[in-house]
Amino acid sequence: MSHLPNLGQPFKKKGGIEMKEKYDVIVIGMGPSSIFLAYELIQLGKNKRILLIEQGKRIENRNCPIEKIGKCTKCKPFCSITSGFSGAGAFSDGKLSLYNKEDETFHVGGNLHEYVGVQKTKELIDYADKIYLKYGADTKLEGIEYKDEVAQISKKAKKEGIDLISIPIRHLGTEKAHKIYKDLQDYLEENKIDMLFETIVDDLIIENNEIKGVKIKPSKEVENEEANTEMILAEKVVIAVGRKGANWLVDMCNKHNIKAKSGIVDIGIRYELPDSIMKDINKYMYEGKFVGRVGPYRDKVRTFCQNPSGFVSSEVYDKNLALVNGHSYKEKKSTNTNLAILVSHNFTYPFNKPIDYGRNVARNLNELGAGNILVQRLGDIYRGKRTWEEELKRNTVIPTLKSAVPGDITYAIGYRTMTDILEFIKSMDKIVEGFANPDNLLYAPEIKFYSNQLIINDNFETSVKGLYSIGDGGGMTRGLMMASASGIQMARNLN
């Protein structure tokens, strides 16, 4: 017997919208997967009652103070870089990873193809790409003009035991990404999609292993366990919380016995070096994705999120952790390229808490930097010493993250992980001359938290009836384009 109340209709005016008695679909999060889900439901024309819930702000109200005051203020209750409409996408460098027509699988972006097949995934990406183009994405594709040159670089990489993954990329740039998502936000509102901002989903309402709705409260009450919550009912609920929601999702899985597999955590650094060293990679591919198992441990090490003439940035995740990232703009340019070097960590028995492990690494690094991102010269690491501010001022590579504190990242990054990173840099130096220049900079921590991978069926439904998962949060995708594609398919599954 249900104990849920009859709320009446409409039961509440909230955030400027008349809340429905019950929604057909509630979507938790407003990243690309959620946006494209709602967009596609509008195209399908079924007039479903849809509610999107987001812990951050409207996109036009998302502002990071770091550019004005030169340091991260750790905005409360949530970081504007990672939370708000379009998630981290609005302030990312805006790279849309496509695919090569001859590819028989997907090497980057996630595993959507494992649920819908390779051909269907390609069709979904094409469809999402047309929407981005409709809203103003650059028509130019990076990484398709210089096939012979890319083949030569790939050949050199193979000799070092490293694979080069080269795929077409549509680069939006941070400015254009912001504009595109603002226009999509307006479109959803114009088409009667209800959106609640600055609101957290405190809990899922589940009875007899079937979703009934969600419990919400204002984001400002996130740390107040005594705060009152309100219930919103729904036929179906879609979890689309992104990597930012990894910790929340683990809690929900544990509390409600939602079936999931253990995830991984990627731990590493943001590497900054002159454009002149990376000029061939930047010209021929814009972003080179290098993956290898080098050094004594044979762990998977990869480059990620390369930003030619870009800027290193700081952002804040749960528990007030400062993490490093990188961005690039269409107009604003530096003379440096930055990219992540990440080591994948899997745990089995007896310890199997990858998110906790990554958080502890980040916390220790933050403490060494007095709450700030740490930066260190590569040459100082080889010499076994910390980097001092005066040395950084004389360095030929000028850091683009001015708030970073010089120090010693090896105090907090484990020996195995650090060895993997340094061995990878040495191998890359044989592919890209100057990659191991002692003046190159390592910023830490760069950590990618992936939640437990939810066990879902081909319709993206979890082990709880009526509860679905899409995007990066539940482990299906890793990036803007495939997350967008997963939202489109979710809409069709719900239709």
Each PLM stretch: what is its role?
Residues 5-11, 20-103, 109, 146-495:
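Residues forming the flavin
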Residues 14-16:
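Short intrinsically disordered terminal tails
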Residues 83-142:
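Dinucleotide-binding Rossmann-like beta1-alpha1 core, especially the glycine-rich loop
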